[in-house]
Amino acid sequence: MDFSAKIIDWYKKNKRDLPWRNTTNPYFVWLSEIILQQTRVNQGLSYFHSFKKEFPSLRKLASAEEDKILKVWEGLGYYSRARNMHFTAKYIIKNLGGNFPKKYEDLLTLKGVGPYTAAAIASFCFNEPKAVVDGNVMRVLSRFLGIYKPINSIEGQKDLNAAATILLNKRKSALHNQAIMEFGAIQCTPANPHCATCVLNTNCYAYANNKVKILPIKNKKKSIRTRYLNYFTIRYKNAIFLNKRLEKGIWKNLYELPLIESENQFDSDKELLKQIKTKFKTENILIVNKTPEITH
């Protein structure tokens, strides 16, 4: 069976019309890949259009104020992506003459660009025969080939990258990569994949051995630490006090309401009030209202 021919034929008939697929401009491809990290396509689409409108070129992005970039990014989360993007735009303009690197290895030197993003840009924009391996591709290959090593382990990712490279259509690498990613996104889905109508089902290990619900395998994540974030709304006349975060972290340079973080939940308003008075070094504080606790 010609694996690549099957998925490319499927892709031509079933692909979604997404704006970053209609260009080989590395700026727009890079922009889309950074936005889609940790973000679903439906949510990322509007942000892609907003960024393209506000910063239509790499030079425009590089010359923009960070606060403006973060404002357009607002709501996407993982704000370090936006900061890295700004840093990289300035670096390319200043040090590379405004031109993106064309080779996979050179793209990896850019801040915020990992193996997946570097492979995507190299393949889609510069026709480098490099396999693009994201979560969708891992799922397809794990099921099709019967790979039991966890996809979030070093060994599993090594095997999956090797398999993706072997199956890659090197003459049509960009089309092949787009096809297998799309196939994983809408055909070989995490839950309830469409196996009965799958063009690969006659050769699929998971389908033949009733392992579709088992594969791919993922190592369990480490336990999550509980944090208690106590925010306050401080009003003075018609103004509300906001604090700019200066310490390192995912929210660096973002504005927030005044915060007291605690290891445990405060047992009473009295204890909470004591902490507020200590933090703001004043006795003239009154708790007027409390909002319900929100778990995130």
Protein language model features and the residues they cover:
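Catalytic cores of DNA base-excision repair glycosylases
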Residues: 3-194, 200-209, 213, 280-281
